[in-house]
């Protein structure tokens, strides 16, 4: 009978003072309110080791994502396709795109990333994996639990009577009319997958779909309310905790948050309460092994002139353009130059238990998460987004017609929706 083991790892990825935050689009690091972490688990005993990692950064794009994944794969003695790296997406944190930073340096634009700091984070995270493997503990059970989160998530896109976006409800929304509007389409549930050695909990992995910011732009580095809820839970239980962002591309706390400083603690406690409730509701099941499967997807680029390399190059090389616009142009060019490299969409299925974890790239809209659940109504579907963030937002095709913020910066074409849903359905299918 197979024997399964679980290793846990973590490393500090807090940037030094002065480091750009959110890709250089906001105030750089002026202080640290709480440290940033890269946290992960390694599942051992299957075909190949599987690595799941969550980083308290805004994002990892293109080559930055691939470098991080490759390093963890080598450390865990597996292949990159069996490694899933995701970002929690708080904004007072680094945003890494190695190729974009090289373009920025060549154009003598303000930096978006310290490449030496990034390489050091990758190296130390891989070292943490290597050090964790000898400490792996036997794993006998997997658990699942679900709890409703009260008064955190709301849809960012508030539509008017004409079907167009009337209000963009950002993470900190001060407009009383926008805040008074209904929550809109969200997934109100936090989901928890846990690993056990008989009655001893080894790790708890949580996911919830929402931008995790209470306030940002002040240069104060923080994992913000979702990371703080995770750490509060770890301190009170002594159990290793991870938090993943679900398909929160069009979801924020804007209905319940005006950016007041005290709201960070309030939102933290609401997420924490759901973590506690999901843990209490956990149902443990014997572990019969797992299957890891993945499919490649080649994303199609936007065709509008503003998204072309030629137009992006003009902005990048314009010394009079704002730093945020120049950096964004570099991100667009880096994306166009990697289109020949597909992105793997992954699924982890725990055999004979109807438990599936779906791992997606980018800032996927909540519609993808809800669609995945409808595809497998017989199963517990744990959806994680914010993997390779090269394409940025992944809206629905309809969203491009409705307007709003996300379609103005999404780098993949509207037909992405059909392509991605097709891949998700194949991965989640019992017949696969």
Task: List PLM regions with ranges.
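Anionic-ligand-binding alpha/beta catalytic cores of soluble enzymes and soluble regulatory domains
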Residues: 271
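Conserved beta-alpha junction segments in alpha/beta enzyme cores
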Residues: 1-240, 246-251, 256-266, 279, ...
């Amino acid at each position: 009978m197979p024997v399964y083991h679980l290793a846990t790892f973590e490393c500090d990825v807090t940037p030094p003072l002065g480091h750009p935050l959110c890709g250089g689009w906001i105030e750089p690091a002026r202080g640290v309110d709480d440290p940033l972490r890269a946290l992960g688990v390694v599942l051992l005993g299957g075909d190949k080791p599987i690595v799941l990692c969550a980083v308290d950064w805004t994002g990892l794009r293109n080559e930055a994502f691939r470098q991080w994944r490759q390093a963890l794969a080598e450390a865990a003695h597996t292949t990159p396709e069996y490694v899933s790296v995701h970002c929690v997406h708080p904004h007072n944190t680094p945003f890494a795109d190695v190729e974009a930073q090289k373009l920025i340096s060549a154009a003598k634009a303000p930096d978006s990333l310290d490449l030496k700091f990034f390489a050091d984070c990758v190296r130390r995270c891989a070292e943490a994996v290597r050090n964790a493997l000898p400490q792996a503990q036997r794993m006998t059970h997997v658990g699942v639990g679900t709890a409703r989160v009260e008064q955190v998530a709301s849809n960012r896109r508030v539509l008017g009577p004409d079907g167009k976006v009337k209000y963009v409800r950002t993470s900190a929304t001060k407009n009383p009319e926008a805040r008074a509007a209904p929550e809109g389409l969200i997934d109100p549930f936090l989901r928890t997958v846990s690993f056990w050695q008989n009655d001893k909990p080894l790790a708890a992995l949580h996911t919830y779909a929402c931008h995790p910011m209470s306030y940002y732009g002040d240069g104060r580095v923080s994992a913000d309310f979702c990371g703080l809820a995770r750490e509060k839970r770890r301190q009170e239980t002594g159990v290793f905790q991870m938090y993943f962002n679900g398909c929160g591309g069009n979801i924020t706390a804007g209905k319940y948050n005006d950016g007041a400083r005290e709201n960070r603690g309030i939102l933290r406690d609401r997420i924490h309460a759901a973590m506690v409730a999901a843990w209490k509701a956990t149902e443990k099941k014997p572990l019969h092994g797992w299957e890891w499967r993945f499919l490649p997807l080649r994303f199609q680029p936007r065709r509008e002139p503003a998204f072309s390399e030629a137009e992006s190059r003009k902005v990048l090389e314009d010394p009079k353009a704002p730093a945020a616009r120049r950096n964004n142009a570099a991100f667009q060019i880096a994306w166009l130059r990697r289109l020949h490299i597909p992105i793997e969409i992954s699924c982890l299925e725990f055999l004979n238990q109807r438990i599936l974890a779906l791992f997606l790239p980018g800032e996927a809209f909540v519609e993808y998460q809800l669609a995945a659940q409808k595809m497998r109504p017989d199963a517990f579907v744990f959806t994680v987004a914010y993997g390779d963030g090269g394409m940025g937002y992944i809206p629905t095709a309809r969203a491009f017609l409705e307007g709003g913020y996300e379609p103005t910066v999404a780098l993949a074409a509207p037909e992405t929706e059909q392509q991605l849903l097709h891949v998700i359905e194949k991965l989640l299918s019992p017949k696969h």
